[in-house]
């Protein structure tokens, strides 16, 4: 760049700094411009690895969607527990009025320090979220769910009144306000969303998410969570096998997936994941029904191996450390890249 243009650029940058504050425009190579992405764990080791950065990124909008009872709220409660364990403050905006405090406590959530709001309208919920973000004192906010963010006009209207596009407009306006503040305060905002079926779709997926298209664009990470099977003990169903696809990721390569077990009353079983991922990486040996680690048998069947690791936390920590090291060396081995899924919406 010639000297005259360089001076003109310096003058412009100086004027921008004066008017909008220092750091309004930066060179990407500047030391302060590039920050390591801070994350909160999802509670699933496999999903943390599939996300590419070790968890859900702070300073971003994340959308978690899926059918009913697929584990959406469980995933967010694990993230809240992770945030609180790191000394952070978390808030849960319960638009569905369905949070189970007992279950949250079992997942490691500190209920005494969890901020909770049960708003009457969608506008109130999103305004509360915006105020918490702008405070800069809250590290993680969960909004459960987009489908329950009912516009005030709809609540005050009569049954059967048409309110086409109201919720989509509400979400679009709120996200325009929220995103800049979220980035500035480094707050992680998670929206839980439900799935609906589009009528008259002949080709492609008929599934779509509620609340219009704004959230699809503003979300840095979108997770599609599905129940893929039941976990049985004798004849009793004690949990679900769950698969999560990373359908959008602006902080790492997308389209990876992870599978894990969710046990009723217990949440995501990290120990079951250690056994499965350990076998995948040849860290845990499997011979028939027996699992072994470094030549020592740790259990016959996954349940017994899981129980053994529960009783020997130092061994579990060692296996986890080796899995993380192996995943760093083989980024696609832990969760195979899948074909790009049909776009939802």
UniProtKB/Swiss-Prot annotation:
<keyword id="KW-0067">ATP-binding</keyword>
<dbReference type="GO" id="GO:0005829">
    <property type="term" value="C:cytosol"/>
</dbReference>
<comment type="similarity">
    <text>Belongs to the RecA family.</text>
</comment>
<dbReference type="GO" id="GO:0009432">
    <property type="term" value="P:SOS response"/>
</dbReference>
<dbReference type="GO" id="GO:0003684">
    <property type="term" value="F:damaged DNA binding"/>
</dbReference>
<comment type="function">
    <text>Can catalyze the hydrolysis of ATP in the presence of single-stranded DNA, the ATP-dependent uptake of single-stranded DNA by duplex DNA, and the ATP-dependent hybridization of homologous single-stranded DNAs. It interacts with LexA causing its activation and leading to its autocatalytic cleavage.</text>
</comment>
<protein>
    <recommendedName>
        <fullName>Protein RecA</fullName>
    </recommendedName>
</protein>
<dbReference type="InterPro" id="IPR023400">
    <property type="entry name" value="RecA_C_sf"/>
</dbReference>
<dbReference type="Pfam" id="PF21096">
    <property type="entry name" value="RecA_C"/>
</dbReference>
<dbReference type="InterPro" id="IPR020587">
    <property type="entry name" value="RecA_monomer-monomer_interface"/>
</dbReference>
<keyword id="KW-0238">DNA-binding</keyword>
<dbReference type="InterPro" id="IPR049261">
    <property type="entry name" value="RecA-like_C"/>
</dbReference>
<dbReference type="InterPro" id="IPR020584">
    <property type="entry name" value="DNA_recomb/repair_RecA_CS"/>
</dbReference>
<dbReference type="GO" id="GO:0016887">
    <property type="term" value="F:ATP hydrolysis activity"/>
</dbReference>
<dbReference type="InterPro" id="IPR020588">
    <property type="entry name" value="RecA_ATP-bd"/>
</dbReference>
<dbReference type="GO" id="GO:0006310">
    <property type="term" value="P:DNA recombination"/>
</dbReference>
<keyword id="KW-0963">Cytoplasm</keyword>
<feature type="binding site">
    <location>
        <begin position="66"/>
        <end position="73"/>
    </location>
    <ligand>
        <name>ATP</name>
    </ligand>
</feature>
<keyword id="KW-0742">SOS response</keyword>
<keyword id="KW-0547">Nucleotide-binding</keyword>
<dbReference type="GO" id="GO:0006281">
    <property type="term" value="P:DNA repair"/>
</dbReference>
<dbReference type="GO" id="GO:0005524">
    <property type="term" value="F:ATP binding"/>
</dbReference>
<dbReference type="InterPro" id="IPR013765">
    <property type="entry name" value="DNA_recomb/repair_RecA"/>
</dbReference>
<dbReference type="GO" id="GO:0003697">
    <property type="term" value="F:single-stranded DNA binding"/>
</dbReference>
<dbReference type="Pfam" id="PF00154">
    <property type="entry name" value="RecA"/>
</dbReference>
<keyword id="KW-0227">DNA damage</keyword>
<keyword id="KW-0233">DNA recombination</keyword>
<dbReference type="InterPro" id="IPR049428">
    <property type="entry name" value="RecA-like_N"/>
</dbReference>
<keyword id="KW-0234">DNA repair</keyword>
<dbReference type="InterPro" id="IPR003593">
    <property type="entry name" value="AAA+_ATPase"/>
</dbReference>
<dbReference type="GO" id="GO:0140664">
    <property type="term" value="F:ATP-dependent DNA damage sensor activity"/>
</dbReference>
<dbReference type="InterPro" id="IPR027417">
    <property type="entry name" value="P-loop_NTPase"/>
</dbReference>
């Amino acid at each position: 760049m010639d000297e005259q243009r360089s001076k003109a650029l310096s003058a412009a940058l100086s004027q921008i700094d004066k008017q909008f504050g220092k750091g309004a425009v930066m060179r990407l190579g500047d030391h302060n411009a590039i920050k390591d992405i801070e994350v909160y764990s999802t509670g699933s080791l496999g999903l943390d690895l599939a996300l590419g950065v070790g968890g859900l990124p702070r300073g971003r909008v994340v959308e978690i969607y899926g059918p009913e009872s697929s584990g959406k709220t469980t995933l967010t409660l694990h993230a809240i527990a992770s945030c609180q364990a790191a000394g952070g403050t978390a808030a849960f905006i319960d638009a569905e009025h369905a949070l189970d405090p007992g279950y949250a406590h079992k997942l490691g959530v500190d209920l005494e320090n969890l901020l909770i709001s049960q708003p009457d309208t969608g506008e109130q919920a999103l305004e509360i979220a915006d105020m918490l973000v702008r405070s800069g004192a809250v590290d993680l906010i969960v909004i459960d769910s987009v489908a329950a963010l009912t516009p005030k006009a709809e609540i005050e209207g009569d049954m059967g009144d048409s309110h086409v596009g109201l919720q989509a407009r509400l979400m679009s306006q709120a996200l325009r306000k929220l995103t800049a503040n979220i980035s500035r305060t480094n707050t992680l905002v998670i929206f839980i969303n439900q799935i609906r079926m589009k009528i008259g779709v002949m080709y492609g997926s008929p599934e779509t998410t509620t609340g219009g298209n704004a959230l699809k664009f503003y979300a840095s990470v979108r997770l599609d969570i599905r129940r893929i099977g039941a976990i049985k003990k004798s004849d009793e169903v004690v949990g679900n096998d769950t698969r999560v696809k990373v359908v959008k990721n602006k902080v790492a390569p997308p389209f990876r997936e992870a599978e894990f077990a969710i046990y009723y009353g217990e949440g995501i079983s990290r120990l079951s994941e250690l056994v499965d991922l350990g076998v995948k990486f040849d860290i845990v040996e499997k011979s028939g029904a027996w699992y072994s680690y470094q030549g020592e048998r740790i259990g016959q069947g996954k349940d017994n191996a899981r129980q053994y690791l529960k009783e020997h936390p130092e061994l579990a920590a060692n296996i986890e450390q080796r899995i993380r090291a192996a995943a760093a060396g083989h980024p696609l081995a832990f969760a195979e890249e899948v074909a790009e899924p049909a776009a939802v919406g």
